[in-house]
Each structure stands twice: as C-alpha cells, then as structure tokens.
C-alpha cells in the first residue's frame, strides 16, 4: 500500500468498527475519524439526544453530511455508523472515495458487545434487542455487501489481529 488510500469501515453496531479503526490508524500511521464522534463533537450532544430530538431521519442527514466531508480527506481511516449505508448517496461517497472494509459479526457477538452500552439509541429495550438486530441485519447487510471491497469476520479475534488481517488484505488489492 504505497500511497495512503482512505479506509472506510462499515458493518453493524458491535462489529468493532471504532476499536479496529483506531488499531488500523495506529498501525498504518493514518488519521482516525469516527462519524458518530464527529457528530457528537459538532452538535455538542450525544447520539441518543440527537435521535430523540431530530429522529433517525434527522440524524441520518447529519451523518451523511459528516461522511461526505470526511471522505474528501486523504489518508484517513473512518469508522462509520451502522446505519450510514441506508442512503445511496452515502454509499456512493464511501465506495468512490476509498476502500470499504465490511466488518462482519454474528447477532450473538453484537448482543454481547452492546449489552451494557447506553449510547445505542436503537437498542434501548433489552427485551427486543435480538429482534431489532436481526431486522437491522436483514435491512443493512445487502448494503454492506454492495459496497465492500474487503470483508472480514471479527467474531473471535482481537482488534489488533483483525487490523493486521485487514492490512494484509489491503496489500493484495
């Protein structure tokens, strides 16, 4: 990977996009961004509050603007929100401006990784979280597949080993 190409991480919540993204950026000496953190920084409020006040559609529009802006930078690693792929325009930004890495994980791992996280506005009713995650997977997985240049399973590996695996795969394309 001679020149520093943008790397965009997509996948469901709990796949490890932020954690793996930080590892990748350190190992490749690239700047790291997290679209959710950027939205929080710009609004001065957490994602749950933005969802409550603006609804999911308002949040997604903010997210689309942030991703449009961030993907024009050079040599970055970007962890996107799980639902960022809902809009075609956002998928186009990602697929045309860098290498898209789809981090795959199981519903079981998602449940385990997100169960104590209060910053997940779509998972605020523990009784129905499995069904919510299954519905989101049904809706979003085709979009992740559509734009993925690389697919990596994250279930039983450390963030560091997933990052090394991604780097190895990047060298092949």
UniProtKB/Swiss-Prot annotation:
Record's subcellular location: Cytoplasm
Annotated catalysed reactions: shikimate + ATP = 3-phosphoshikimate + ADP + H(+)
A Pfam family per the record: SKI
Cofactor: Mg(2+)
InterPro entries noted in UniProt: P-loop_NTPase (IPR027417), Shikimate/glucono_kinase (IPR031322), Shikimate_kinase/TSH1 (IPR000623), Shikimate_kinase_CS (IPR023000)
Principal location: cytoplasm
UniProt keyword list: Amino-acid biosynthesis, Aromatic amino acid biosynthesis, ATP-binding, Cytoplasm, Kinase, Magnesium, Metal-binding, Nucleotide-binding, Transferase
Signal peptide: none
GO BP term, example: aromatic amino acid family biosynthetic process
Pathway: Metabolic intermediate biosynthesis; chorismate biosynthesis; chorismate from D-erythrose 4-phosphate and phosphoenolpyruvate: step 5/7
GO molecular function term, any single one: magnesium ion binding
Chain sites annotated for binding ATP: 14-19, 120, 157
Domain of life: Bacteria
Cystine residue pairs: none
GO terms under cellular component: cytosol
EC identifiers of the protein: 2.7.1.71
Cofactor note: Binds 1 Mg(2+) ion per subunit.
Binding site for Mg(2+): 18
Binding site for substrate: 36, 60, 82, 140
HAMAP family reported in the protein's UniProt record: Shikimate_kinase (MF_00109)
Family to which this protein belongs: Belongs to the shikimate kinase family.
Job description of the protein: Catalyzes the specific phosphorylation of the 3-hydroxyl group of shikimic acid using ATP as a cosubstrate.
Descriptive protein name: Shikimate kinase
């Amino acid at each position: 990977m001679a020149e520093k190409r943008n790397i965009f991480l997509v996948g469901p919540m709990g796949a490890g996009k932020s954690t793996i993204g930080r590892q990748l950026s350190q190992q490749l000496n690239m700047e790291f961004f997290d679209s959710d953190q950027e939205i929080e920084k710009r609004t001065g409020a957490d994602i749950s509050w933005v969802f409550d006040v603006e609804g999911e559609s308002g949040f997604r529009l903010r997210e689309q603007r942030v991703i449009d802006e961030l993907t024009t930078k050079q040599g970055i690693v970007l962890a996107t929100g799980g639902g960022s792929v809902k809009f075609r325009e956002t998928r186009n930004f990602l697929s045309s401006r860098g290498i898209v890495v789809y981090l795959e994980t199981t519903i079981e791992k998602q449940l385990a990784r997100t169960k104590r996280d209060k910053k997940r506005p779509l998972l605020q009713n523990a009784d129905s979280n499995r069904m919510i995650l299954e519905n989101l997977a049904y809706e979003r997985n085709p979009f992740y597949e559509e734009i993925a240049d690389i697919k990596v399973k994250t279930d039983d590996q450390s963030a560091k080993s997933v990052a090394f695996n991604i780097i190895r795969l990047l060298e092949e394309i």
